[in-house]
Amino acid sequence: MSILNREGSVLDHVGSHYTDIDTDELLDRIRADLHPPQQQFFDNQNEIVGLSAGYGAGKTRALCSMAVKLAAQNIGFIGAVMEPTAPLIRDIWQTDFELFLEQYEIPYTFRASPLPEYTMHFKEGDSKLLCRSFENWSRIIGLNLSHVLVDEIDVVSPVIADKAFPKILGRLRAGNVRQFCAASTPEGFRWLYNTFGTDEAKERTDRELIKMRTQDNPHLPSDFIERMQANYDPSMLAAYLNGEFVNLTTGMVYSRFTREQNVTNSKPDIGLEPLRIGIDFNIQNTNA
């Protein structure tokens, strides 16, 4: 065995990919270990599924669960998982996915070159999962895929994501269950919002967005949320704790303004004080 290929997880029959694990029982065990929003994502049958999640909410584990489920439902076909960049495939996806496969004793074979890919060995047969970077999304053009999973899609430039999305959907033309699943912490009004959050998107019947809060994950350190609350402003907390779509680039001061606390009708004696005036040169009306 070369360092570019390896086998993992309870290959009890050395040199063989045989497994007697009951696939339905395996998927039931995986689902039982998920918290409710993860289960909602796992159970979703829409063609396009989004997961908008706070930090530490468990979105990567949700994607790992979905990757195994879709692989089991598409025996003999090919799926793909995508991270924003190639290093993130190695640093995030491969580490977490292999731990997941080992935890559930799912036999697999990994090939690192020329591009990383996993083959999962089920009782009914094999299923392949390609690992690709979203920055090089065009590499999947020409493939017939059953499913595509994308992690941290809001980190990708909206120009690239918007161009790649319809092309990737065009690859979903094989297998028994064809799905596009994307998970990310929302970064303002980017791809997740445009695809799931607009009024037009909400009227579509082919897609659904699931929101997952940081506090939904019972496995986080007890002080994790408290530390975030102590260091993030309200807008960032709405996005990074609750998975909400908020403006993270403009209007940061305005959202904290309240007339009761910041406006007064009394005029203190300031005759001897220097006069300081602040002006906000807005796009439309100027405020002083």
How would you label these PLM feature ranges?
Residues 157-231:
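ASCE P-loop NTPase helicase motor core
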Residues 77-89:
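Conserved RecA-like ASCE P-loop NTPase motor core of nucleic-acid helicases/translocases
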Residues 60-74:
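Walker A/P-loop NTP-binding motif
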Residues 151-155:
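Walker B catalytic acidic pair
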Residues 56:
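Walker A (P-loop) phosphate-binding loop of P-loop NTPases
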Residues 217-285:
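ATPase catalytic-site recognition across NTP-hydrolyzing enzymes
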